[in-house]
Amino acid sequence: MLKREGKVQPYTKTLDGGWGWMIVIHFFLVNVFVMGMTKTFAIFFVVFQEEFEGTSEQIGWIGSIMSSLRFCAGPLVAIICDILGEKTTSILGAFVVTGGYLISSWATSIPFLCVTMGLLPGLGSAFLYQVAAVVTTKYFKKRLALSTAIARSGMGLTFLLAPFTKFLIDLYDWTGALILFGAIALNLVPSSMLLRPIHIKSENNSGIKDKGSSLSAHGPEAHATETHCHETEESTIKDSTTQKAGLPSKNLTVSQNQSEEFYNGPNRNRLLLKSDEESDKVISWSCKQLFDISLFRNPFFYIFTWSFLLSQLAYFIPTFHLVARAKTLGIDIMDASYLVSVAGILETVSQIISGWVADQNWIKKYHYHKSYLILCGITNLLAPLATTFPLLMTYTICFAIFAGGYLALILPVLVDLCRNSTVNRFLGLASFFAGMAVLSGPPIAGWLYDYTQTYNGSFYFSGICYLLSSVSFFFVPLAERWKNSLT
Protein backbone atom coordinates (compact mmCIF):
# COMPACT_ATOMS: atom_id res chain seq x y z
CA MET A 1 0.00 0.00 0.00
CA LEU A 2 1.22 3.50 -0.81
CA LYS A 3 1.29 6.05 1.98
CA ARG A 4 2.46 9.62 1.97
CA GLU A 5 4.36 10.82 5.01
CA GLY A 6 4.79 14.43 6.03
CA LYS A 7 2.94 17.44 4.73
CA VAL A 8 4.24 18.97 1.54
CA GLN A 9 2.58 22.16 0.39
CA PRO A 10 1.09 21.46 -3.07
CA TYR A 11 1.24 24.22 -5.70
CA THR A 12 -0.49 24.42 -9.06
CA LYS A 13 2.42 26.20 -10.73
CA THR A 14 6.13 26.91 -10.22
CA LEU A 15 6.66 29.50 -7.47
CA ASP A 16 9.22 31.71 -9.28
CA GLY A 17 10.02 33.24 -5.90
CA GLY A 18 9.02 32.72 -2.28
CA TRP A 19 11.10 30.01 -0.63
CA GLY A 20 12.83 29.60 -3.98
CA TRP A 21 15.03 32.57 -3.11
CA MET A 22 16.31 30.62 -0.09
CA ILE A 23 17.30 27.87 -2.52
CA VAL A 24 19.13 30.51 -4.57
CA ILE A 25 21.00 31.62 -1.42
CA HIS A 26 22.16 28.04 -0.84
CA PHE A 27 23.15 27.67 -4.51
CA PHE A 28 25.03 30.97 -4.23
CA LEU A 29 26.96 29.72 -1.18
CA VAL A 30 27.80 26.48 -3.01
CA ASN A 31 29.34 28.53 -5.79
CA VAL A 32 31.24 30.74 -3.32
CA PHE A 33 32.63 28.09 -0.98
CA VAL A 34 33.09 25.18 -3.39
CA MET A 35 33.35 26.48 -6.94
CA GLY A 36 35.15 29.65 -5.87
CA MET A 37 37.74 27.68 -3.94
CA THR A 38 38.14 25.37 -6.93
CA LYS A 39 39.09 28.36 -9.06
CA THR A 40 41.72 29.45 -6.53
CA PHE A 41 43.57 26.25 -7.40
CA ALA A 42 45.49 28.48 -9.82
CA ILE A 43 47.30 29.91 -6.79
CA PHE A 44 47.92 26.49 -5.23
CA PHE A 45 49.19 25.35 -8.66
CA VAL A 46 52.23 27.61 -8.34
CA VAL A 47 52.76 26.73 -4.66
CA PHE A 48 52.68 22.97 -5.36
CA GLN A 49 55.19 23.40 -8.19
CA GLU A 50 57.65 24.87 -5.71
CA GLU A 51 56.78 22.55 -2.81
CA PHE A 52 56.77 19.18 -4.60
CA GLU A 53 58.90 20.13 -7.63
CA GLY A 54 56.37 18.55 -9.97
CA THR A 55 55.79 19.25 -13.63
CA SER A 56 52.84 21.29 -14.88
CA GLU A 57 51.30 18.12 -16.27
CA GLN A 58 51.55 16.26 -12.95
CA ILE A 59 50.09 19.06 -10.85
CA GLY A 60 47.47 19.70 -13.53
CA TRP A 61 45.98 16.29 -12.71
CA ILE A 62 44.96 17.54 -9.25
CA GLY A 63 42.80 20.33 -10.63
CA SER A 64 41.67 18.13 -13.49
CA ILE A 65 40.33 15.40 -11.20
CA MET A 66 38.69 17.99 -8.95
CA SER A 67 36.96 19.71 -11.87
CA SER A 68 35.98 16.62 -13.84
CA LEU A 69 34.45 14.71 -10.94
CA ARG A 70 31.93 17.50 -10.43
CA PHE A 71 30.60 16.46 -13.82
CA CYS A 72 31.45 12.75 -14.06
CA ALA A 73 29.67 11.96 -10.81
CA GLY A 74 26.36 13.27 -12.19
CA PRO A 75 24.66 9.86 -12.58
CA LEU A 76 25.96 8.80 -9.15
CA VAL A 77 24.49 11.94 -7.58
CA ALA A 78 21.09 11.10 -9.06
CA ILE A 79 21.24 7.61 -7.52
CA ILE A 80 22.31 8.96 -4.11
CA CYS A 81 19.46 11.49 -4.25
CA ASP A 82 17.07 8.63 -4.93
CA ILE A 83 18.32 6.79 -1.85
CA LEU A 84 18.98 9.59 0.65
CA GLY A 85 17.02 12.57 -0.64
CA GLU A 86 18.30 15.88 -1.95
CA LYS A 87 18.86 17.57 1.41
CA THR A 88 20.82 14.64 2.89
CA THR A 89 22.86 14.28 -0.30
CA SER A 90 23.85 17.93 -0.12
CA ILE A 91 24.89 17.61 3.54
CA LEU A 92 26.95 14.53 2.68
CA GLY A 93 28.67 16.49 -0.09
CA ALA A 94 29.61 19.26 2.35
CA PHE A 95 31.26 16.76 4.69
CA VAL A 96 33.15 15.12 1.81
CA VAL A 97 34.54 18.47 0.62
CA THR A 98 35.53 19.42 4.16
CA GLY A 99 37.25 16.08 4.75
CA GLY A 100 39.14 16.38 1.48
CA TYR A 101 40.65 19.76 2.33
CA LEU A 102 41.53 18.73 5.88
CA ILE A 103 43.28 15.52 4.80
CA SER A 104 45.10 17.44 2.03
CA SER A 105 46.90 19.47 4.68
CA TRP A 106 48.91 16.31 5.49
CA ALA A 107 49.92 15.70 1.88
CA THR A 108 53.48 14.62 1.16
CA SER A 109 53.26 13.97 -2.58
CA ILE A 110 51.35 14.86 -5.73
CA PRO A 111 49.57 11.44 -5.98
CA PHE A 112 48.34 11.97 -2.40
CA LEU A 113 46.90 15.35 -3.39
CA CYS A 114 45.26 13.82 -6.47
CA VAL A 115 43.11 11.77 -4.09
CA THR A 116 42.59 14.18 -1.19
CA MET A 117 42.39 17.52 -3.04
CA GLY A 118 41.24 16.14 -6.37
CA LEU A 119 38.90 13.20 -5.81
CA LEU A 120 37.24 14.08 -2.48
CA PRO A 121 36.44 17.79 -3.07
CA GLY A 122 35.47 16.93 -6.65
CA LEU A 123 33.00 14.27 -5.53
CA GLY A 124 31.58 16.48 -2.79
CA SER A 125 31.23 19.36 -5.25
CA ALA A 126 29.18 17.11 -7.54
CA PHE A 127 26.79 16.31 -4.69
CA LEU A 128 26.41 19.94 -3.72
CA TYR A 129 26.25 21.50 -7.17
CA GLN A 130 23.88 19.13 -8.97
CA VAL A 131 21.42 18.98 -6.07
CA ALA A 132 21.32 22.78 -5.83
CA ALA A 133 20.88 23.14 -9.61
CA VAL A 134 18.05 20.60 -9.83
CA VAL A 135 16.14 22.02 -6.85
CA THR A 136 16.45 25.51 -8.35
CA THR A 137 14.75 24.34 -11.57
CA LYS A 138 11.86 23.06 -9.44
CA TYR A 139 11.25 26.45 -7.86
CA PHE A 140 11.79 28.69 -10.91
CA LYS A 141 10.59 28.80 -14.50
CA LYS A 142 10.05 32.36 -15.77
CA ARG A 143 12.93 33.69 -13.65
CA LEU A 144 15.16 30.65 -14.06
CA ALA A 145 17.92 32.46 -15.96
CA LEU A 146 18.06 35.33 -13.46
CA SER A 147 17.93 33.07 -10.39
CA THR A 148 20.64 30.83 -11.83
CA ALA A 149 22.78 33.85 -12.70
CA ILE A 150 22.48 35.22 -9.16
CA ALA A 151 23.43 31.83 -7.73
CA ARG A 152 26.34 31.29 -10.11
CA SER A 153 27.62 34.80 -9.46
CA GLY A 154 28.91 33.40 -6.20
CA MET A 155 31.63 31.72 -8.23
CA GLY A 156 32.76 35.16 -9.27
CA LEU A 157 33.53 36.08 -5.68
CA THR A 158 36.99 34.68 -6.28
CA PHE A 159 37.89 38.38 -6.51
CA LEU A 160 37.83 38.13 -2.70
CA LEU A 161 39.02 34.55 -2.37
CA ALA A 162 42.13 34.92 -4.56
CA PRO A 163 43.95 37.57 -2.45
CA PHE A 164 42.50 35.93 0.68
CA THR A 165 43.99 32.59 -0.36
CA LYS A 166 47.38 34.18 -1.05
CA PHE A 167 47.19 35.92 2.34
CA LEU A 168 46.41 32.63 4.12
CA ILE A 169 49.27 30.85 2.36
CA ASP A 170 51.71 33.61 3.35
CA LEU A 171 50.43 33.62 6.93
CA TYR A 172 49.80 29.93 7.65
CA ASP A 173 51.57 28.18 4.76
CA TRP A 174 49.58 26.09 2.27
CA THR A 175 48.75 23.46 4.91
CA GLY A 176 47.07 25.99 7.19
CA ALA A 177 45.21 27.50 4.23
CA LEU A 178 43.75 24.10 3.35
CA ILE A 179 42.61 23.52 6.94
CA LEU A 180 40.79 26.86 6.90
CA PHE A 181 39.26 25.99 3.52
CA GLY A 182 37.86 22.83 5.08
CA ALA A 183 36.35 24.84 7.94
CA ILE A 184 34.78 27.30 5.49
CA ALA A 185 33.25 24.50 3.40
CA LEU A 186 31.61 23.11 6.55
CA ASN A 187 29.22 26.09 6.48
CA LEU A 188 27.41 24.36 3.62
CA VAL A 189 25.95 21.86 6.10
CA PRO A 190 23.48 24.34 7.65
CA SER A 191 22.80 26.00 4.30
CA SER A 192 21.80 22.59 2.88
CA MET A 193 18.97 22.58 5.41
CA LEU A 194 17.29 25.20 3.22
CA LEU A 195 16.53 22.58 0.54
CA ARG A 196 12.84 22.23 1.35
CA PRO A 197 10.98 19.73 -0.89
CA ILE A 198 8.28 21.09 -3.18
CA HIS A 199 5.39 19.35 -4.92
CA ILE A 200 3.68 20.82 -7.98
CA LYS A 201 0.16 19.56 -8.66
CA SER A 202 -0.49 18.41 -12.20
CA GLU A 203 -3.29 20.26 -13.93
CA ASN A 204 -4.22 17.28 -16.10
CA ASN A 205 -4.33 14.29 -13.80
CA SER A 206 -3.73 10.91 -15.33
CA GLY A 207 -3.40 7.78 -13.28
CA ILE A 208 -1.12 4.80 -13.52
CA LYS A 209 -2.79 2.41 -15.86
CA ASP A 210 -2.87 -1.34 -15.96
CA LYS A 211 -0.38 -1.64 -18.84
CA GLY A 212 2.61 0.36 -17.72
CA SER A 213 2.62 3.61 -15.78
CA SER A 214 1.79 6.88 -17.49
CA LEU A 215 2.97 10.11 -15.88
CA SER A 216 1.30 13.40 -16.74
CA ALA A 217 4.01 15.79 -17.90
CA HIS A 218 4.28 19.52 -18.27
CA GLY A 219 7.78 20.27 -19.53
CA PRO A 220 9.74 23.47 -19.47
CA GLU A 221 8.03 24.56 -22.66
CA ALA A 222 4.59 23.82 -21.13
CA HIS A 223 3.86 21.12 -23.69
CA ALA A 224 1.81 18.23 -22.36
CA THR A 225 3.59 14.93 -22.84
CA GLU A 226 3.56 11.46 -21.43
CA THR A 227 6.45 9.42 -20.14
CA HIS A 228 5.78 5.72 -20.24
CA CYS A 229 7.69 3.61 -17.78
CA HIS A 230 7.28 -0.06 -18.59
CA GLU A 231 8.10 -2.09 -15.54
CA THR A 232 8.89 -5.77 -15.32
CA GLU A 233 6.09 -7.71 -17.00
CA GLU A 234 4.33 -4.35 -17.51
CA SER A 235 3.06 -4.54 -13.95
CA THR A 236 1.67 -1.56 -12.04
CA ILE A 237 2.07 -0.26 -8.54
CA LYS A 238 -1.07 -1.35 -6.77
CA ASP A 239 -2.28 -1.90 -3.28
CA SER A 240 -2.28 -5.69 -3.22
CA THR A 241 -4.64 -5.82 -0.25
CA THR A 242 -7.09 -3.45 -1.87
CA GLN A 243 -6.93 -5.34 -5.14
CA LYS A 244 -7.72 -8.64 -3.47
CA ALA A 245 -10.71 -7.06 -1.76
CA GLY A 246 -12.06 -6.10 -5.15
CA LEU A 247 -11.63 -2.39 -4.56
CA PRO A 248 -10.29 -0.11 -7.30
CA SER A 249 -6.55 0.45 -7.27
CA LYS A 250 -5.21 3.89 -6.39
CA ASN A 251 -3.76 6.22 -8.98
CA LEU A 252 -0.55 8.17 -8.55
CA THR A 253 -0.03 11.35 -10.55
CA VAL A 254 3.24 13.23 -10.89
CA SER A 255 3.76 16.41 -12.91
CA GLN A 256 6.69 16.36 -15.33
CA ASN A 257 8.07 19.59 -13.94
CA GLN A 258 8.52 17.67 -10.72
CA SER A 259 8.48 14.13 -12.10
CA GLU A 260 12.02 13.51 -11.02
CA GLU A 261 10.79 14.04 -7.46
CA PHE A 262 8.97 10.73 -7.73
CA TYR A 263 12.25 8.90 -7.84
CA ASN A 264 14.26 11.59 -6.02
CA GLY A 265 14.68 11.58 -2.29
CA PRO A 266 12.05 14.02 -1.00
CA ASN A 267 9.08 12.20 -2.53
CA ARG A 268 10.64 8.79 -2.50
CA ASN A 269 11.15 8.97 1.24
CA ARG A 270 7.47 9.78 1.69
CA LEU A 271 6.35 6.77 -0.29
CA LEU A 272 6.41 3.69 1.90
CA LEU A 273 5.88 0.38 0.15
CA LYS A 274 4.95 -2.49 2.42
CA SER A 275 5.66 -5.20 -0.10
CA ASP A 276 9.27 -6.08 -0.95
CA GLU A 277 8.12 -7.09 -4.41
CA GLU A 278 6.53 -3.70 -4.99
CA SER A 279 9.68 -2.00 -3.68
CA ASP A 280 11.77 -3.90 -6.21
CA LYS A 281 9.46 -2.73 -8.98
CA VAL A 282 9.81 0.92 -7.98
CA ILE A 283 13.62 0.61 -7.72
CA SER A 284 13.70 -1.01 -11.15
CA TRP A 285 11.53 1.81 -12.49
CA SER A 286 13.87 4.43 -10.98
CA CYS A 287 16.96 2.84 -12.55
CA LYS A 288 15.30 2.69 -15.96
CA GLN A 289 14.37 6.35 -15.64
CA LEU A 290 17.90 7.27 -14.55
CA PHE A 291 19.60 5.48 -17.44
CA ASP A 292 16.84 6.16 -19.95
CA ILE A 293 18.30 5.30 -23.35
CA SER A 294 15.70 7.58 -24.94
CA LEU A 295 18.15 10.43 -24.25
CA PHE A 296 20.44 8.94 -26.91
CA ARG A 297 17.57 9.27 -29.41
CA ASN A 298 17.12 12.93 -28.51
CA PRO A 299 19.09 15.25 -30.86
CA PHE A 300 18.95 18.05 -28.29
CA PHE A 301 20.89 15.85 -25.87
CA TYR A 302 23.76 15.60 -28.37
CA ILE A 303 23.61 19.33 -29.12
CA PHE A 304 23.83 20.31 -25.46
CA THR A 305 26.36 17.65 -24.45
CA TRP A 306 28.75 18.53 -27.30
CA SER A 307 28.72 22.21 -26.36
CA PHE A 308 28.81 21.56 -22.61
CA LEU A 309 31.69 19.11 -22.98
CA LEU A 310 33.95 21.39 -25.02
CA SER A 311 33.10 24.63 -23.21
CA GLN A 312 33.87 23.15 -19.79
CA LEU A 313 37.08 21.63 -21.17
CA ALA A 314 38.10 25.07 -22.45
CA TYR A 315 37.06 27.04 -19.37
CA PHE A 316 39.35 25.43 -16.82
CA ILE A 317 42.53 25.77 -18.91
CA PRO A 318 42.89 29.59 -18.71
CA THR A 319 41.40 29.51 -15.21
CA PHE A 320 44.13 27.23 -13.87
CA HIS A 321 47.01 28.61 -15.95
CA LEU A 322 46.38 32.35 -15.83
CA VAL A 323 48.51 32.99 -12.73
CA ALA A 324 51.23 30.59 -13.90
CA ARG A 325 51.45 32.37 -17.27
CA ALA A 326 51.69 35.74 -15.55
CA LYS A 327 54.60 34.41 -13.51
CA THR A 328 56.45 33.29 -16.66
CA LEU A 329 56.07 36.86 -17.97
CA GLY A 330 57.88 38.17 -14.88
CA ILE A 331 54.75 39.43 -13.12
CA ASP A 332 54.74 39.19 -9.31
CA ILE A 333 52.42 36.46 -8.01
CA MET A 334 50.55 38.94 -5.79
CA ASP A 335 49.88 41.16 -8.80
CA ALA A 336 48.86 38.05 -10.74
CA SER A 337 46.30 37.20 -8.05
CA TYR A 338 44.61 40.52 -8.84
CA LEU A 339 43.93 39.19 -12.33
CA VAL A 340 41.83 36.47 -10.71
CA SER A 341 40.11 39.11 -8.57
CA VAL A 342 39.19 41.30 -11.54
CA ALA A 343 37.97 38.25 -13.44
CA GLY A 344 35.77 37.32 -10.48
CA ILE A 345 34.17 40.75 -10.20
CA LEU A 346 33.41 41.06 -13.90
CA GLU A 347 32.22 37.48 -14.20
CA THR A 348 29.77 38.11 -11.35
CA VAL A 349 28.33 41.25 -12.93
CA SER A 350 28.25 39.64 -16.38
CA GLN A 351 26.30 36.62 -15.16
CA ILE A 352 23.59 38.71 -13.52
CA ILE A 353 23.18 40.96 -16.57
CA SER A 354 23.21 37.96 -18.92
CA GLY A 355 20.55 36.18 -16.86
CA TRP A 356 18.29 39.23 -16.75
CA VAL A 357 18.60 39.83 -20.50
CA ALA A 358 17.87 36.17 -21.28
CA ASP A 359 14.72 36.23 -19.13
CA GLN A 360 13.32 39.05 -21.30
CA ASN A 361 12.91 36.45 -24.08
CA TRP A 362 13.80 38.87 -26.86
CA ILE A 363 15.45 35.95 -28.65
CA LYS A 364 15.92 32.31 -27.71
CA LYS A 365 18.42 31.77 -24.92
CA TYR A 366 20.69 29.47 -26.91
CA HIS A 367 21.46 32.33 -29.34
CA TYR A 368 22.99 34.35 -26.50
CA HIS A 369 24.83 31.25 -25.29
CA LYS A 370 26.24 30.54 -28.74
CA SER A 371 27.45 34.13 -29.20
CA TYR A 372 29.26 34.19 -25.86
CA LEU A 373 31.04 30.92 -26.69
CA ILE A 374 32.31 32.32 -30.00
CA LEU A 375 33.57 35.48 -28.28
CA CYS A 376 35.34 33.38 -25.62
CA GLY A 377 37.05 31.43 -28.39
CA ILE A 378 38.28 34.53 -30.19
CA THR A 379 39.50 36.06 -26.91
CA ASN A 380 41.58 33.00 -26.00
CA LEU A 381 43.07 32.77 -29.49
CA LEU A 382 44.29 36.35 -29.04
CA ALA A 383 45.54 35.72 -25.47
CA PRO A 384 49.18 34.92 -26.48
CA LEU A 385 49.47 38.52 -27.69
CA ALA A 386 49.11 39.67 -24.07
CA THR A 387 52.74 39.81 -22.92
CA THR A 388 52.56 42.68 -20.41
CA PHE A 389 50.46 43.17 -17.28
CA PRO A 390 48.11 45.78 -18.88
CA LEU A 391 47.52 43.53 -21.91
CA LEU A 392 47.01 40.49 -19.69
CA MET A 393 44.50 42.49 -17.66
CA THR A 394 42.69 43.42 -20.89
CA TYR A 395 42.48 39.74 -21.84
CA THR A 396 41.21 38.88 -18.36
CA ILE A 397 38.48 41.53 -18.53
CA CYS A 398 37.21 40.39 -21.94
CA PHE A 399 37.29 36.70 -21.09
CA ALA A 400 35.53 37.23 -17.74
CA ILE A 401 32.68 39.19 -19.37
CA PHE A 402 32.08 36.64 -22.11
CA ALA A 403 32.57 33.61 -19.84
CA GLY A 404 30.14 35.02 -17.29
CA GLY A 405 27.60 35.52 -20.05
CA TYR A 406 27.53 31.89 -21.17
CA LEU A 407 27.96 30.36 -17.69
CA ALA A 408 24.75 32.04 -16.52
CA LEU A 409 22.80 30.40 -19.34
CA ILE A 410 23.96 26.78 -19.09
CA LEU A 411 21.07 25.64 -16.88
CA PRO A 412 18.33 27.70 -18.63
CA VAL A 413 19.49 26.44 -22.05
CA LEU A 414 19.49 22.88 -20.71
CA VAL A 415 15.91 23.26 -19.43
CA ASP A 416 14.80 24.66 -22.79
CA LEU A 417 16.43 21.82 -24.73
CA CYS A 418 15.66 18.83 -22.50
CA ARG A 419 11.95 19.17 -23.32
CA ASN A 420 10.30 15.94 -22.16
CA SER A 421 13.29 14.60 -20.24
CA THR A 422 13.65 15.37 -16.56
CA VAL A 423 16.41 17.81 -15.67
CA ASN A 424 18.14 15.44 -13.24
CA ARG A 425 18.70 12.67 -15.81
CA PHE A 426 19.54 15.06 -18.66
CA LEU A 427 22.01 17.06 -16.58
CA GLY A 428 23.52 13.97 -14.94
CA LEU A 429 24.27 12.14 -18.17
CA ALA A 430 25.48 15.26 -20.00
CA SER A 431 27.72 16.09 -17.04
CA PHE A 432 29.20 12.60 -17.09
CA PHE A 433 30.44 12.99 -20.66
CA ALA A 434 31.60 16.56 -20.01
CA GLY A 435 33.56 15.37 -16.99
CA MET A 436 35.48 12.86 -19.09
CA ALA A 437 36.70 15.73 -21.27
CA VAL A 438 37.42 18.08 -18.37
CA LEU A 439 39.57 15.35 -16.83
CA SER A 440 42.04 15.59 -19.71
CA GLY A 441 41.97 19.37 -20.24
CA PRO A 442 44.46 20.77 -17.68
CA PRO A 443 46.93 17.87 -18.10
CA ILE A 444 46.93 18.41 -21.87
CA ALA A 445 47.53 22.12 -21.33
CA GLY A 446 50.27 21.29 -18.83
CA TRP A 447 51.87 18.88 -21.29
CA LEU A 448 51.81 21.59 -23.96
CA TYR A 449 53.71 23.89 -21.59
CA ASP A 450 56.23 21.21 -20.62
CA TYR A 451 56.81 20.51 -24.32
CA THR A 452 56.94 24.12 -25.57
CA GLN A 453 57.96 25.94 -22.35
CA THR A 454 55.24 28.50 -23.04
CA TYR A 455 51.54 28.70 -22.18
CA ASN A 456 50.60 30.00 -25.64
CA GLY A 457 49.63 26.52 -26.82
CA SER A 458 47.30 26.09 -23.84
CA PHE A 459 45.35 29.23 -24.68
CA TYR A 460 45.20 28.32 -28.38
CA PHE A 461 43.79 24.93 -27.39
CA SER A 462 41.19 26.60 -25.16
CA GLY A 463 40.14 29.01 -27.91
CA ILE A 464 39.67 26.23 -30.47
CA CYS A 465 37.56 24.23 -28.00
CA TYR A 466 35.32 27.26 -27.38
CA LEU A 467 34.74 27.80 -31.10
CA LEU A 468 33.94 24.12 -31.62
CA SER A 469 31.54 24.15 -28.65
CA SER A 470 29.37 26.75 -30.38
CA VAL A 471 28.99 24.70 -33.57
CA SER A 472 26.31 22.33 -32.23
CA PHE A 473 23.86 25.17 -31.52
CA PHE A 474 23.68 25.95 -35.25
CA PHE A 475 21.84 22.62 -35.58
CA VAL A 476 19.04 23.49 -33.11
CA PRO A 477 16.61 24.70 -35.85
CA LEU A 478 17.25 21.49 -37.80
CA ALA A 479 16.61 19.39 -34.69
CA GLU A 480 13.40 21.32 -33.99
CA ARG A 481 12.10 20.69 -37.51
CA TRP A 482 12.95 17.00 -37.20
CA LYS A 483 11.12 16.79 -33.86
CA ASN A 484 8.07 18.59 -35.26
CA SER A 485 7.94 16.24 -38.23
CA LEU A 486 7.49 13.30 -35.85
CA THR A 487 4.43 14.81 -34.18
Swiss-Prot record:
Biased composition (Polar residues): 238-250
Subcellular location: Cell membrane
GO cellular component: membrane; plasma membrane
Transmembrane segments: 17-37, 60-80, 88-108, 110-129, 144-164, 175-195, 300-320, 338-358, 373-393, 395-415, 426-446, 459-479
UniProt feature, compositional bias: Basic and acidic residues: 220-237
One Pfam family named in its UniProt record: MFS_1
Sequence ranges on the Extracellular membrane side: 38-59, 109, 165-174, 321-337, 394, 447-458
Membrane topology: Multi-pass membrane protein
Recorded GO MF terms: monocarboxylic acid transmembrane transporter activity; symporter activity
Biological role: Proton-linked monocarboxylate transporter. Catalyzes the rapid transport across the plasma membrane of many monocarboxylates such as lactate, pyruvate, branched-chain oxo acids derived from leucine, valine and isoleucine, and the ketone bodies acetoacetate, beta-hydroxybutyrate and acetate.
Name the record gives this protein: Monocarboxylate transporter 5
Species, as recorded: Homo sapiens
